[in-house]
Structures are given as structure tokens and as C-alpha cells.
Regions:
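Short acidic, Gly/Ser-rich segments with clustered Asp/Glu that frequently serve as metal-coordination loops
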Residues: 130-134
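Short alpha-helical catalytic segment bearing the HExxH-like zincin motif
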Residues: 107, 121-129
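A broad, structural surface signal
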Residues: 127, 220-223
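Hydrophobic or amphipathic, alpha-helical segments that drive membrane association/targeting
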Residues: 1-105, 111-116, 120, 135-140, ...
Length: 238
């Protein structure tokens, strides 16, 4: 793969989308309580920090990309995701960005729709993003590292209001807390405060690494599916 030649390693295909593999594929930082918490409150994070499609001039995939759109839907089904809204933008380069999980939205750089594109690498990018949608980790994946701890602290204090996050201004935490509270649109399960306390006890000072960790999780899932280190290298570099 390092020389550009693909290794002969069969991938697991769409079986890699099975959430039962999460314990094996998720980095250590993404503990079981944190993954469970994201499953329950990740939609609120997406709502609190929406990706502005207008600012990047994103438009729906063109009609001539209908075949690719069908492939996206087929892959998404394996992740338990349906009716993916796919957009294209000239502003984001050769990448696929998971915008939100509810509704499920992906944004592609326009170069990924050009003729001659490496379709294997493009598929890798789609699979990686679909994993992040399945995990409800889209917002974490695209938040700047410097902002991750205030955002995560705000999320945790929604469910553990007496906890004081170290190393971040209380005013900033309160701002994020209110933003996330405003995006909660349904009653959450009774175990959410317990999960939040477990995350508080384990995350330490590593919140700024969460974006890297969730993207690693997506990369591992896509690599398992594809079995192609060359495609992974191209996709990760995008």
C-alpha cells in the first residue's frame, strides 16, 4: 500500500457496519459509556451545532450522479441508516463530511464526482462517514480540537449539573449547556445521567482528542470493510 500497490487482503464488506464490532474497532478513548451516551444525545449535538450547508454552497447531488446516490443508500442500509440526503460542494475539497444523523446528511467535495476519481477511495470515505452517522459522532468529528472540551463539558453538565469542568471557563460551559439543552427534542432515558457520570470519571483531560478518536473509528471500520490499505491511505489523506 505504501508504494501505491493494493494489497491482496479481502475486506469484510458491509458486515463491517455491524455495531457489535464496536468494542474491537473503537479507540480506547471512546469507552462504552461514551459511545452509549453519544447514541442517546448525539442528535442534540447535531442540532446544537448544525453544519451550515448554505455557507459552503452545498446542493443536492446532480441527476447524473444517481448511480452513486443509489450506492450510498445501499451502504447506508447496512449501518441501519435510511434516506440519506447527499449534497455536493465546491468549497470542501476531496472529502466526505458527515453533517448530521437526523436527518442523515453527507456532504461531498465536488472533485469526488469528477470522472476518473478513485472510486475505491471514495467508497472508503463514504463508509467512514456512515460509521460516524451511525455512532451519532458527526459533530465531534468536525469540531476543532480547541473547542471540543467546552462542547463536551457543556453536554455533560446538562445531565450532571453540579459537576464543574476543570480547565474551562464556567461561563463558556454554561453557554454550551444551554445550546445543547435547547436542541433536546425528546425525553431521554433514565440512564443518561449515569452514563454522563461514567464519562466524567474516565475522560480526564483527553476531550481534545475526541475528534481524532472518532475519525480513527470511522477509518478502522472502512478499512475492515474495504480490505484496501491503499484506498485507506488515499481516503485518510483527503
Amino acid at each position: 500500500a505504501l508504494t501505491g500497490a493494493d494489497a491482496s487482503i479481502p475486506g469484510a464488506g458491509l458486515a463491517a457496519a455491524d455495531a457489535r464490532l464496536d468494542d474491537l474497532l473503537a479507540p480506547e478513548l471512546l469507552s462504552l459509556p461514551l459511545r452509549a451516551l453519544l447514541k442517546k444525545v448525539g442528535d442534540a449535538l447535531d442540532g446544537a451545532y448544525p453544519m451550515d450547508l448554505r455557507s459552503i454552497r452545498a446542493t443536492p447531488l446532480p441527476a447524473e450522479a444517481s448511480g452513486f446516490a443509489q450506492q450510498i443508500q445501499q451502504m447506508a442500509t447496512a449501518f441501519g441508516i435510511h434516506n440519506v440526503e447527499a449534497y455536493v460542494s465546491t468549497a470542501i475539497g476531496p472529502s466526505c463530511i458527515p453533517a448530521s444523523a437526523a436527518p442523515p446528511r453527507l456532504v461531498f467535495g465536488s472533485v469526488l464526482l469528477e470522472k476518473g476519481i478513485d472510486e475505491t477511495a471514495r467508497t472508503f470515505l463514504v463508509l467512514r462517514s456512515l460509521k460516524l452517522l451511525q455512532a451519532r459522532a458527526a459533530t465531534l468529528s468536525r469540531t476543532a480540537p480547541i473547542d471540543l472540551w467546552p462542547v463536551v463539558a457543556g453536554m455533560l453538565t446538562v445531565f450532571a449539573p453540579t459537576w464543574q469542568a476543570p480547565g474551562v471557563e464556567p461561563k463558556k460551559v454554561a453557554e454550551h449547556q444551554q445550546r445543547i439543552k435547547g436542541a433536546l427534542v425528546r425525553q431521554l432515558d433514565d440512564d443518561v445521567p449515569v452514563l454522563a457520570m461514567e464519562v466524567i470519571g474516565s475522560i480526564g483531560n483527553r476531550a481534545s482528542q475526541l475528534g481524532t478518536a472518532v475519525n480513527q473509528w470511522g477509518n478502522r471500520t472502512a478499512l475492515l470493510a474495504m480490505g484496501s490499505p491503499a484506498a485507506a491511505l488515499i481516503g485518510i489523506a483527503a
